[in-house]
């Protein structure tokens, strides 16, 4: 590994003086490692050369098994298997395309909007090799979303799929910085470069840049639940963090593992869970190109392929449980992880009963990556997002950054002083005011409300501005939404605060009904739902107001925009 070779003696673990070889071995095997931060990390690091190329070398030396590094399938019978050596070749070609054909250089911004196709991985690592800052986005983006992202970031290039070419073309004239447009497509498009053709003719010889640990690597747009999406800029520490032995306990991946992470490529979880985490461990990334999630296909895939770990949104597990198949004992699956929201307690139990496996919950943001989790060896507390993952010192704080005692509601904070931890975003690009707003004393204030118990388990309540103060009671919307989700009439719901002349605020639920309940008497159904909530949770949490809607406002990443609903209630729209 390049940066290791430049150090004859590295003193990075307290009490140890390590040669490069010893350090590498300790990085990949030590379990009880102390905290790492910017002071004891290497000065230079690049995921492409120090991780992917390392495993390519291990393959050449016969020190890694025959399993592919990348295994991609779709529903039409197509299959791709790439070794780390093949990935090295293809990503070097990609880097040459960016530098020699597109004229891009270190520090330039590239918008990456692709579905789950192999080229997404090539572009991402190609950007790492060149120092180009990649900015992933979901293919659900519309023209106005793309315009906003390109303009605010001053992106010089975009790589996207054929279906989004018209969307980009409709706004390209308003993006003076956008010089290069590359498309992943089977057909040519006027004014666009054919990405696949270019990498076929490009040279596989490329010298990776020597990036500093603090050099920018990626920008992830926030979900926009509280306004326009902000640009959370991350440096190389986001990738290096996966080296930290304590961080490697998250999934405990081995080179023999096959990980299926179902995250949308536009989210930070895809960069971490579909690329950084598995390839740091030298294991296989498995991808099924699902344009839309089909629970039947998911079940079939888990039976057909030797997948050992699964990382998916709660809705995926919920949909699988709804399948009528009697057998969900997947032959090779060993570990399941979820995040984004909580499953109901009975859903956790059903999954355990039907698969024999527990579901471990993780929590994170665009700014943090995964910051807390229920690790494999930890006791599972249903509804908890687990404990903080090193190097994050996660505490519950008040508005001034004071640490609150256990079981006291506050904000999830991550300590940033005296040292900003690896993996935490650098800043909100082009928005120093927004960056300052989330710095709270010695902590980064996530804006998410939670409590922490005596054992260090964190209990998520919701966004800070989502918490409802009704008649002196503070109510987290997630609690009420989970209660409503247990009723068969409710397809999905969003709970917000609504003004009330007598109580100041009351709980209001916006509910999308399942089709079979659309013809029911609405007044009677409201009473039934209110009674149901009272029966399954504290009665003061029940929604005094209920409105049935056909759909809920959501961000492009699928998060409910409660702020929009709340503003409507208080007449701010």
Curated annotation (Swiss-Prot):
Coiled-coil annotated residue ranges, if any: none
Required cofactor(s): Mg(2+); Mn(2+)
Modified residues (N6-succinyllysine): 81, 142, 179, 200, 233, 324, 352, 387, 501, 534
Annotated tissue distribution: Highly expressed in liver and kidney.
GO biological process assignments: fatty acid biosynthetic process
Protease found in the keyword field: no
GO cellular component: mitochondrial matrix; mitochondrion
Alphabetical list of InterPro entries matching this protein: AMP-bd_C, AMP-bd_C_sf, AMP-binding_CS, AMP-dep_synth/lig_dom, ANL_N_sf, Mitochondrial_ACSM
Superkingdom to which the source organism belongs: Eukaryota
Catalytic reaction list: a medium-chain fatty acid + ATP + CoA = a medium-chain fatty acyl-CoA + AMP + diphosphate; benzoate + ATP + CoA = benzoyl-CoA + AMP + diphosphate; (R)-lipoate + GTP + H(+) = (R)-lipoyl-GMP + diphosphate; octanoate + ATP + CoA = octanoyl-CoA + AMP + diphosphate
An example Gene Ontology molecular-function term: GTP binding
EC number: 6.2.1.2, 6.2.1.25
EC class of the enzyme, as a word: ligase
Keyword terms: Acetylation, ATP-binding, Fatty acid metabolism, GTP-binding, Ligase, Lipid metabolism, Magnesium, Metal-binding, Mitochondrion, Nucleotide-binding, Transit peptide
Subcellular location(s) of the protein: Mitochondrion matrix; Mitochondrion
Range of the transit peptide: 1-35
Positions contributing to ATP binding: 222-230, 448, 463, 559
Post-translational modification N6-acetyllysine, affected residues: 142, 200, 210, 352, 387, 527, 534, 545
Subunit structure: Monomer.
Family assignment from sequence similarity: Belongs to the ATP-dependent AMP-binding enzyme family.
Role summary: Catalyzes the activation of fatty acids by CoA to produce an acyl-CoA, the first step in fatty acid metabolism. Capable of activating medium-chain fatty acids (e.g. butyric (C4) to decanoic (C10) acids), and certain carboxylate-containing xenobiotics, e.g. benzoate. Also catalyzes the activation of lipoate to lipoyl-nucleoside monophosphate. Activates lipoate with GTP at a 1000-fold higher rate than with ATP and activates both (R)- and (S)-lipoate to the respective lipoyl-GMP, with a preference for (R)-lipoate.
Name of the protein in its database record: Acyl-coenzyme A synthetase ACSM1, mitochondrial
């Amino acid at each position: 590994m390049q940066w290791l070779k430049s150090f004859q003696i590295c003193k990075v673990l307290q009490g140890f003086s390590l040669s490069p070889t010893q350090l590498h071995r300790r990085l990949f095997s030590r379990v009880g490692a102390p905290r790492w931060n910017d002071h004891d990390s290497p000065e230079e690091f690049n995921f492409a050369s120090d991780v992917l190329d390392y495993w390519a070398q291990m393959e050449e030396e016969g020190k890694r098994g025959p399993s592919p590094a990348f295994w991609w399938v779709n529903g039409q019978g197509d299959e791709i298997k790439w070794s780390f050596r093949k990935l090295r070749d293809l990503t070097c070609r990609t880097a040459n395309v960016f530098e020699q054909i597109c004229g891009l250089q270190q520090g330039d911004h590239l918008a990456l909007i692709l579905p789950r196709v192999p080229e997404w991985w090539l572009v991402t690592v190609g950007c790492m090799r060149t120092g180009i800052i990649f900015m992933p986005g979901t293919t659900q983006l519309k023209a106005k979303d793309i315009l906003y992202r390109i303009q605010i970031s001053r992106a010089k290039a975009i790589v996207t799929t054929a279906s989004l070419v018209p969307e980009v073309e409709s706004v390209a004239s308003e993006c003076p910085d956008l010089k290069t447009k590359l498309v992943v497509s089977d057909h040519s498009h006027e004014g666009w470069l054919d990405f696949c053709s270019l990498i076929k003719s490009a040279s596989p010889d490329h010298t990776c840049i020597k990036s500093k640990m603090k050099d920018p690597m990626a920008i992830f747009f926030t979900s926009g639940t509280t306004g326009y999406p902000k640009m959370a800029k991350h440096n190389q520490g986001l990738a290096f963090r996966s080296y930290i032995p304590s961080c490697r306990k998250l999934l405990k991946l081995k080179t023999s593992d096959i990980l299926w992470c179902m995250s949308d490529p536009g989210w930070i979880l895809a960069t971490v869970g579909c690329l950084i985490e598995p390839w740091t461990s030298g294991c296989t990334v498995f991808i099924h190109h699902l344009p839309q999630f089909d629970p039947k296909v998911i079940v079939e895939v888990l039976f057909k392929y030797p997948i050992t770990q699964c990382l998916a949104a709660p809705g995926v597990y919920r949909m699988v449980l709804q399948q009528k198949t009697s057998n969900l004992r997947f032959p090779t699956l060993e570990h399941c992880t979820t995040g984004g929201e909580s499953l109901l307690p009975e859903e956790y139990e059903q999954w355990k009963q039907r698969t024999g496996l527990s579901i471990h919950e993780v929590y994170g943001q665009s700014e943090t990556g995964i910051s807390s989790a229920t690790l494999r060896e930890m006791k599972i507390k249903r509804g908890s997002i687990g404990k903080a993952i090193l190097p994050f010192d996660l505490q519950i704080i008040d508005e001034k950054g004071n640490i609150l005692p256990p079981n006291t509601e506050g904000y999830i904070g991550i300590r940033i002083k005296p040292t900003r931890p690896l993996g935490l975003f650098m800043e909100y690009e082009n928005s120093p005011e927004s960056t300052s707003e989330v710095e709270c004393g010695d902590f980064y204030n996530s804006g998410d409300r939670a409590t922490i118990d005596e054992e260090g388990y964190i209990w998520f309540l919701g966004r800070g501005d989502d918490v409802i103060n009704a008649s002196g009671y503070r109510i987290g919307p997630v609690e009420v939404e989970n209660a409503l989700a247990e009723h068969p009439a409710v397809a999905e719901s969003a709970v917000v605060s609504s003004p009330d002349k007598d109580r100041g605020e009351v709980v209001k639920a916006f509910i999308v009904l399942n089709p079979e309940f659309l013809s029911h008497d609405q007044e009677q159904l409201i009473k039934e739902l209110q009674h149901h909530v009272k029966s399954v949770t504290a009665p003061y949490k029940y929604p005094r107001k209920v409105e049935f809607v056909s759909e809920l406002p959501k961000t492009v990443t699928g998060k409910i925009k409660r702020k929009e609903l709340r503003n409507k209630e208080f007449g701010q729209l």
